[in-house]
């Protein structure tokens, strides 16, 4: 199946959702270099959820950071491992997120980027992004590296879920009536890509209130 074969499924012909195939390809290696620079100051770590479990996805942040621990889920400007502010978002991050959002019909000024690293066997359960202070802003999600199966549902956990293959350089934008949709990633399969045997996901959000 080619990437064009995956376009235009009925589930995503709806207000607020855009799948931008290959949108980040021209910036891919610069994005990876920016990730490496961030990780040098704020290493990847496996966060703990309130129930005590350990997330299979390794995470770090730029800008205002998303944090999970036994106390709950929240945003914090400080990296709890170092006690220092999270690294600033590189200009290439901000520019890409703004351009992708504009392509999808949104104005967007992100102030937080959660960086996820999926190794084979890692996954992300269905969830909503609801810890932010500005639901009028969209979510912009960038895929780099190994392909993954993205799950995108409705506003209720038991709503039907669409499975869609995401490839290196693809960007998904959702906002408006779809802003609080449940979404997740199925278990990553082993493979090889030019950037390595893993997948990066950059999730851009507007954390601060409007």
Where are these regions (language model features)?
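Non-heme Fe(II) oxygenase metal-center motifs and adjacent flexible, charged/small-residue loops
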Residues: 1-210
């Amino acid at each position: 199946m080619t990437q064009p074969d995956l376009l235009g499924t009925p589930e995503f012909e709806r207000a607020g959702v855009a799948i931008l195939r290959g949108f980040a390809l021209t910036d891919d290696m610069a994005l990876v270099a920016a990730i490496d620079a961030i990780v040098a100051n704020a290493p990847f770590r496996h966060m703990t959820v309130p129930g005590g479990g350990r997330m299979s996805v390794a995470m770090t942040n730029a800008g205002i950071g998303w944090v999970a621990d036994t106390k709950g889920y929240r945003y914090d400007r400080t990296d709890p491992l170092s006690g220092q502010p999270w690294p600033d978002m590189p200009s290439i991050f901000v520019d890409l997120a703004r351009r992708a959002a504009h392509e999808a019909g949104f104005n967007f000024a992100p102030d937080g980027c959660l960086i996820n690293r999926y190794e084979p066997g890692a996954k992300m359960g269905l969830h909503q992004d609801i810890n932010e202070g500005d639901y009028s802003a969209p979510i912009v999600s960038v895929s780099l590296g190994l392909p993954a199966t993205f799950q995108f549902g409705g506003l209720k956990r038991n709503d039907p879920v669409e499975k869609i293959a995401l490839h290196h350089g693809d960007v998904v934008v959702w906002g408006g009536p779809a802003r609080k949709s449940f979404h997740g990633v199925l278990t990553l399969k082993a493979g090889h890509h030019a950037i390595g045997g893993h997948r990066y996901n950059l999730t851009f959000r507007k954390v601060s209130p409007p």
